[in-house]
Every structure is written in C-alpha cells, then in structure tokens.
C-alpha cells in the first residue's frame, strides 16, 4: 500500500514540510490514517511526513479495533521493564536516527521544501516538546545546534507532561524525565521549577480533549513547559483521539496557518 507521501504531485515536493510523530502503540502508517483529514486541509500549504518510532510495542488502547492489520506497532520511549538494558544515550541516539531516516527518506523521494514544524500525538507530542526544548536551550545559550532542521513551531495533540531530557550532557533539569522513563521519579527541584530554561520558546499549538483521562497532564505541559505568550490552546469535546470531524479540524488548521504566517514559514 503506497504511503500518502508518495501520492503528492510535483508541486508538493517543494512545499514546507512538517514532521509528524505518532503515538505509542501505533506506527507511522496508522498516524497517516489518523491524520487524513488534517493532511487534506494542509495539503495546499505543507507536505506532511510521518516518522516511525524505533521500538516495537504492544498496540495502544483501541488500536486493534481499527488497525489490527497494521502491525508492527511502535513506541518512541523504551519504558517497559524488559527495556532496562537501553541507556539514556542509546535511546536518544535511536530517536534521532528514526527522525533522520524519515527526513532522508523523504529527501530521496525528491522533496526539497524546508523542514519547518513538528506535529505529534500523545507520546509523539511528548517527544515534539522534548525536541523543541533541546533546540531552544541550545539556541538561548548560543551553543552549537543539534544537526538537522530548525523547527519554527510545534503542534501538540494530547501531549502529556513531562517532556524528556534529550540533551542531558549539555542541559538537564529535574523538570524533565529521563528517556527511559515516562514520568519524573522524584519531586522537581524548586529552583528548576521556577526557571524558564526547560520551557519551549517557539510557538506551540495545543489541542486537548476535555474527556481525555490525561487532560491534567496536557494542561501541565502547556502551563509548565512553554514560555507565556507563545501558546495557542484548543479545547474540544473528545477523549484521547486525533480530530476527524471537519468542524474540529478547521479550528486546528486555522491556528496552524496563522502561526505559520507569524513565524514567516508561509507568506501571503
């Protein structure tokens, strides 16, 4: 079955590109399907590229009811007991390699547009925030950037706090969890909590379902991990899902296009 990325016409090859990171217990192919309405609305403006997480996983809740034939299922973070052999450095390497493979694969298809943004759902959204923190900390300290694109903004769909420390050798904070964990194992240091070093500085759009069991963690992600004045919030009547109804998607698309123009990614 061809990827949606293979069906773009030649004009789309030069469009700005958004890298999309799927949730835990799914995979890139499933996330393409989950984002089909979002993709259709963004197609005139962006090329969406879907990365595949590095670690195999059991299917996420409800995944097999629709996508049972889409195995193997993947996850970005090796937090299960059987994954204890993976060091934090190895996890970061595996994540970076998976992202690099998605970028190189799309380049080989002839795509030439700039990489401009990250979009993630659930565990993928946690990773989007983690990547943006790594980028912003290095930039704010005038340090050499990590090799790869500069991300102008992020789209956070049901992203649970806390983000992950992807650059512990350069910057670490008790507000961030280790790559081999899903949560912080001890209370954060008060000085770290009051600092803005762990907060994302580029614009982010947060879409949060009001019936999602993780809503309090989604709100924490926005309130505790973003610089004030850089965020946009969409609350909608849904659980832990990607928006499919046009009325819900339209709101998200409006925010994405507005932020893209504000950051200079798109020009009228």
Swiss-Prot record:
Among Gene3D superfamilies, the record links this protein to: alpha/beta hydrolase (3.40.50.1820)
- Keyword presence, NADP: no
Give the GO molecular function terms.
hydrolase activity
Instruction: Please describe what happens when the gene is knocked out.
Output: Completely abolishes the production of pestalotiollide B.
Query: What name is this protein filed under?
Result: Esterase GME11355
E.C. designation(s): 3.1.2.-
Gene Ontology cellular-component terms listed? cytoplasm; nucleus
Task: Indicate the family of this protein.
Answer: Belongs to the LovG family.
| The protein's role, per its UniProt record | Esterase; part of the gene cluster that mediates the biosynthesis of dibenzodioxocinones such as pestalotiollide B, a novel class of inhibitors against cholesterol ester transfer protein (CEPT). The biosynthesis initiates from condensation of acetate and malonate units catalyzed by the non-reducing PKS pks8/GME11356. Pks8/GME11356 lacks a thioesterase (TE) domain, which is important to the cyclizing of the third ring of atrochrysone carboxylic acid, and the esterase GME11355 might play the role of TE and catalyzes the cyclization reaction of the C ring.
Which one GO biological process term can you cite for this protein? Answer: secondary metabolite biosynthetic process
Q: Name one Pfam family in it.
A: FSH1
Q: What induces this protein's gene, according to its Swiss-Prot or TrEMBL record? A: The expression of the dibenzodioxocinones biosynthesis cluster is positively regulated by the transcription factor dibT.
Q: Which cysteines are joined by disulfide bonds?
A: none
Q: What is the lineage of its organism?
A: Eukaryota, Fungi, Dikarya, Ascomycota, Pezizomycotina
Active site (UniProt)? 122, 212, 240
Using the UniProt record, name the top-level EC class of this enzyme in a single word: hydrolase
Q: Which pathway does the record list?
A: Secondary metabolite biosynthesis
The record's section on SUPFAM superfamilies has: alpha/beta-Hydrolases
């Amino acid at each position: 079955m061809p990827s949606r990325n293979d069906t773009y016409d030649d004009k789309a090859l030069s469009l700005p590109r958004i890298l999309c990171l799927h949730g835990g217990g799914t995979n890139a192919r499933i996330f393409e399907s989950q984002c089909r309405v979002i993709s259709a609305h963004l197609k005139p403006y962006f090329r969406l590229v879907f990365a595949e997480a590095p670690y195999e996983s059991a299917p996420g809740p409800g995944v097999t009811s629709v996508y049972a034939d889409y195995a193997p299922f993947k996850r970005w973070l090796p937090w299960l007991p059987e994954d204890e052999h993976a060091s934090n450095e190895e996890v970061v390497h595996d994540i970076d390699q998976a992202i690099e493979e998605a970028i190189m694969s799309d380049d080989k298809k002839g795509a030439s547009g700039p990489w401009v943004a990250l979009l993630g759902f659930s565990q993928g959204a946690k990773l989007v925030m983690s990547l943006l923190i790594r980028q912003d900390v290095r930039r704010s300290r005038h340090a050499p950037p990590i090799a790869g694109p500069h991300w102008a903004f992020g789209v956070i769909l049901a992203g649970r706090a806390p983000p992950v420390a992807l650059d512990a050798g350069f910057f670490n904070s008790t507000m961030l969890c280790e790559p081999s964990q899903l949560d912080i194992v001890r209370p954060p240091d008060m000085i770290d909590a009051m600092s803005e070093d762990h907060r994302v500085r580029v614009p982010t759009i947060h879409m949060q379902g009001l019936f999602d069991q993780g809503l309090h963690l989604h709100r924490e992600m926005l309130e505790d991990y973003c610089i004030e004045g850089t965020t946009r919030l969409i609350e909608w009547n849904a659980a832990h899902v990607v928006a499919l109804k046009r009325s819900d998607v339209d709101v998200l698309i409006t925010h994405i296009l507005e932020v893209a123009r504000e950051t200079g990614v798109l020009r009228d």
